[in-house]
């Protein structure tokens, strides 16, 4: 089915982005005029998790630098208020207690702040135990520094261990096909787990997005099933799975797929699965446009047997489709002919002759 040459009567779906969800599952929705104030910043953890790595590294580096600079200013202020900037630290006055040895400039204060935060050990600069303000500031910097390091370490671990990263190994076919199964037309797509570790409790759902005449997007649920599994979820996902949606007269796709140039729509497919090792739920998404649904096609065979009898998956055939040749329907029901027996013009009895075979 090719809808690239047809006019699309959906202004919202036909602008810069022809799809609401990209093939790799990212949303193209843009929130214009949304207020991103304190309410948005309250979810700082979620903001960090959604950041790209380069921005996350920049934020963390800036956090450390700002932390060092703030306490460098405070250490410099302590030295200035204590009168440590004008005296000779090697030969201090007898009645003067130096708070931090050899802090005579802002550069020295920044260096001391860096040494305190990284706990690399004091050299010529060290705080005096007889200066209460220096001891208090040292405790505050150490406490806040440990909190900052714990937060950054946790953010790194959480971002690396996100279930979203496991979902990248789930792959959908680029195209969906409409083929016959058990004599009924079905919309079919395939999904593969490209990692050897299995997924469990696999669930698939789909939503059909259409634009109404009033400009609103209408959502319709589309049900998919997996072969003969009666439950809503597949308990084990290690080899490619094929999902079917039977196109009946009540199906929301029935009228859309009857035309050679259908109106624009988007079918978004969601797959949720549980990681066997961690028990976390990961989700993978994709979408199909009318131009990505092939009529009268089926997918090429994926499963083969190896030399030792083991199953093998030919992933090079994962996105391949082949034309579906319609098979003539042969009726095996006998053809019956009613015959009447007449004697002397009167009907005596009647019987049937069953003729089997093909009729022209």
UniProtKB/Swiss-Prot annotation:
Biological process, per Gene Ontology: potassium ion import across plasma membrane; regulation of monoatomic ion transmembrane transport
Protein activity control: Inhibited by Ba(2+) and Cs(+), although sensitivity to those inhibitors is much lower than in other Kir channels.
In-chain residues carrying the UniProt-annotated modification Phosphoserine: 201, 287
Cytoplasmic side: 1-50, 158-360
Major subcellular location class: membrane
A GO molecular-function annotation: inward rectifier potassium channel activity
Intramembrane segments: 106-122
Superkingdom assignment: Eukaryota
Catalyzed reactions per annotation: K(+)(in) = K(+)(out)
Purpose of the protein: Inward rectifier potassium channels are characterized by a greater tendency to allow potassium to flow into the cell rather than out of it. Their voltage dependence is regulated by the concentration of extracellular potassium; as external potassium is raised, the voltage range of the channel opening shifts to more positive voltages. The inward rectification is mainly due to the blockage of outward current by internal magnesium.
Protein name stated in the entry: Inward rectifier potassium channel 13
UniProt organism field: Rattus norvegicus
Gene name per UniProt: Kcnj13
């Amino acid at each position: 089915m090719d809808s690239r040459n047809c006019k699309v009567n959906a202004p919202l779906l036909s602008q810069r982005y022809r799809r609401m969800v990209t093939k790799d599952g990212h949303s193209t929705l843009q929130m214009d005029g949304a207020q991103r104030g304190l309410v948005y910043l309250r979810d700082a953890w979620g903001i960090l998790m959604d950041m790209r790595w380069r921005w996350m590294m920049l934020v963390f580096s800036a956090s450390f630098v700002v932390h060092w600079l703030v306490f460098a200013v405070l250490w410099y202020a302590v030295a200035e208020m204590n009168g440590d900037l004008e005296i000779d630290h090697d030969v201090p006055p007898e009645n003067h207690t130096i708070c931090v040895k050899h802090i005579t400039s802002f550069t020295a204060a920044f260096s001391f702040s860096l040494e305190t935060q990284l706990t690399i050990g004091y050299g010529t600069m060290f705080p005096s135990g007889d200066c209460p303000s220096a001891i208090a500031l040292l405790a505050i910097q150490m406490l806040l520094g440990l909190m900052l390091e714990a937060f950054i370490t946790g953010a790194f671990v959480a971002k690396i261990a996100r279930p979203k990263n496991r979902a990248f190994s789930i792959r959908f076919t680029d195209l969906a096909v409409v083929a016959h199964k058990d004599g009924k037309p079905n919309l079919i797509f395939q999904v593969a787990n490209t990692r050897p570790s299995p997924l469990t409790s696999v669930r698939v759902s789909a939503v059909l997005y259409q634009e109404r005449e009033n400009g609103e997007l209408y959502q319709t649920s589309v049900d998919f099933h997996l072969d003969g599994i009666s439950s809503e979820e597949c308990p084990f996902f290690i080899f490619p799975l094929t999902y079917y949606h039977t196109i009946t007269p009540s199906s929301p796709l029935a009228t859309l797929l009857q035309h050679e140039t259908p109106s624009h729509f988007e079918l978004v497919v969601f797959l949720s699965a549980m990681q066997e090792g961690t028990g976390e739920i990961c989700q993978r998404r994709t979408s199909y446009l009318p131009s990505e649904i092939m009529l009268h096609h089926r997918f090429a065979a994926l499963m083969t047997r190896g030399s030792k009898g083991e199953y093998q998956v030919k992933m090079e055939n994962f996105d391949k489709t082949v034309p579906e040749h319609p098979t003539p329907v042969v009726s095996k029901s006998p053809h019956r002919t009613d015959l009447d027996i007449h004697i002397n013009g009167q009907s005596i009895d009647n019987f049937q002759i069953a003729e089997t075979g093909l009729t022209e």
